[in-house]
């Protein structure tokens, strides 16, 4: 376990590790326990009762945060002709086809999200071994393989975030910055929680949401009582 600094240890004293806090209280604690000297990201981790090894219990999707993440994503779109023009008009940072495939194969990664039209996936598929491990491969489940490239770009720029269950059954999602108003962080949290409830696989048995933790960059984790979140289930 890495050695923790004095500020972190002082922040940790403010947290009751055995308690699951109401979301409003948890957000307040995240701000009080933030030890970073920059505008830290606030992230939520969900431990879900699923077996990711089973194909029918895979969870992957995307949700538009009502107040964004505090960061504007750089979007690369693989498209041709009119669709390329639509992507450019919508605000995509990079639009093209084979030239960007070649750049990525040579180690270029100045982007955060990749969108592709379905007709481009034959070519983009060549990048699977490069983009896949980085979580950047376009996927219909996240709305990043689509002919409606304008909508995809606009949603991503507005604060759309992807989520994907890892091998241990966890999902990590950024919900904003510590500088955000508490209410905005709570509403972003609720949007993510509602999306995950809707994404529950039919094959999942037992307790679905096992544990929820909210934290800031470099700050301690704070358990959240998800029943205090008002969402339409």
From Swiss-Prot:
Keywords associated with the record: Repressor, Ribonucleoprotein, Ribosomal protein, RNA-binding, rRNA-binding, Translation regulation, tRNA-binding
GO terms under cellular component: large ribosomal subunit
Keyword Magnesium: no
Superkingdom of origin organism: Bacteria
Keyword hit for RNA-binding: yes
GO MF annotation list: rRNA binding; structural constituent of ribosome; tRNA binding
Function (record text): Binds directly to 23S rRNA. The L1 stalk is quite mobile in the ribosome, and is involved in E site tRNA release.
Family affiliation: Belongs to the universal ribosomal protein uL1 family.
Subunit structure: Part of the 50S ribosomal subunit.
Classification via PANTHER family: 54S RIBOSOMAL PROTEIN L1, MITOCHONDRIAL (PTHR36427), LARGE RIBOSOMAL SUBUNIT PROTEIN UL1M (PTHR36427:SF3)
Record's protein name: Large ribosomal subunit protein uL1
Species annotation: Geobacillus stearothermophilus (Bacillus stearothermophilus)
Lineage: Bacteria, Bacillati, Bacillota, Bacilli, Bacillales
């Amino acid at each position: 376990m890495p050695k923790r600094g004095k500020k972190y240890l002082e922040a940790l004293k403010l947290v009751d590790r055995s308690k699951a806090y109401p979301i409003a209280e948890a957000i307040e604690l995240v701000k009080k326990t933030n030890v970073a000297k920059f505008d830290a990201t606030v992230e939520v981790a969900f431990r879900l009762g699923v077996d990711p090894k089973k194909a029918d219990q895979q969870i992957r999707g995307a949700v538009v945060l009502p107040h964004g993440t505090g960061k504007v994503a750089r979007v690369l779109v693989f498209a041709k002709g009119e669709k390329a023009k639509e992507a450019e008009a919508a605000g995509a940072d990079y639009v093209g086809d084979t030239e960007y495939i070649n750049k990525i194969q040579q180690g270029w990664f100045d982007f955060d999200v990749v969108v592709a039209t379905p007709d481009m996936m034959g070519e983009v598929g060549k990048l699977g071994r490069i983009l896949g491990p980085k979580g950047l491969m376009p996927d219909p489940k996240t709305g990043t393989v689509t002919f409606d490239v304008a909508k995809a770009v606009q949603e991503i720029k507005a604060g759309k975030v992807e989520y994907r269950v890892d091998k241990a059954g966890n999902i990590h999602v950024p919900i904003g910055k510590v500088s955000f108003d508490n209410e905005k962080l709570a509403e972003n949290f609720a949007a993510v929680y509602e999306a995950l409830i809707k994404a529950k696989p039919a094959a999942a048995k037992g307790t679905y949401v096992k544990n929820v933790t909210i934290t800031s960059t470099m700050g301690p984790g704070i358990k959240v009582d998800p029943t205090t979140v008002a969402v339409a289930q």
